[in-house]
From Swiss-Prot:
PANTHER family, sorted: MEDIATOR OF RNA POLYMERASE II TRANSCRIPTION SUBUNIT 20, UBIQUITIN SPECIFIC PROTEASE HOMOLOG 49
Function: Component of the Mediator complex, a coactivator involved in the regulated transcription of nearly all RNA polymerase II-dependent genes. Mediator functions as a bridge to convey information from gene-specific regulatory proteins to the basal RNA polymerase II transcription machinery. The Mediator complex, having a compact conformation in its free form, is recruited to promoters by direct interactions with regulatory proteins and serves for the assembly of a functional preinitiation complex with RNA polymerase II and the general transcription factors.
Subunit annotation: Component of the Mediator complex.
Protein name per UniProt: Mediator of RNA polymerase II transcription subunit 20
Major site of localization recorded for this protein: nucleus
Gene that encodes it: med20
Family: Belongs to the Mediator complex subunit 20 family.
GO CC, alphabetical: mediator complex; nucleus
Alphabetized GO MF terms: transcription coactivator activity
Localisation: Nucleus
Keywords, comma-separated and alphabetical: Nucleus
Keyword Nucleus: yes
Amino acid sequence: MPVHGVIYYSSPSMATFLSPAQDNLVRTYFAQHLKKWVVQYKLYRNAVTPKTLEFLKQNINPSMLACVDEATMIDAEPELEDIIVRTKLWNFRQSFTIEGSIYEVGSFKVAIANVLQKSVWKGILFHVTYDGTESVDLARPIIQEFFLKCFLQNNKSVTPVYESFFNQPRHSLDSKLLLQLFKQRIDTVSQRT
């Protein structure tokens, strides 16, 4: 079972970081481009009650995840969102999009993507998967060293907003984890305003 490292930065100094990071990965580490990575998150508010409805779609996962509250998450067909919009019982509130690519470098799979709210840059997300061990304790320093060497060699002073290391059987990020990441982002924005 691979070990995953998810790291999210929102420092303005990293706003133009995606393209050079991808180029460096390919040129220096001979990374093989596997596919594009696109995630779309949408938040709706109930027109009558103070409830929220969230949708999450990934191009690497055919089903859509719908979440009415934190305890209830279901796999849904994309048509569900069309029905929600047409009934006008839910009002669109905001959306985030992750746009990037997935690469393979030896025992690592690396996904790098910009996080956008409409067209405004909100951060950069890194997802590193390591197949060398199943132990999170052993893999964490290996992933961190790989990450620093590949991406932050000249910019070590930037600190992540979110960092997590864990086991998961699949190589792609679980939709529920991405939903939690977006929730954290929304909560952080709400606290600032």
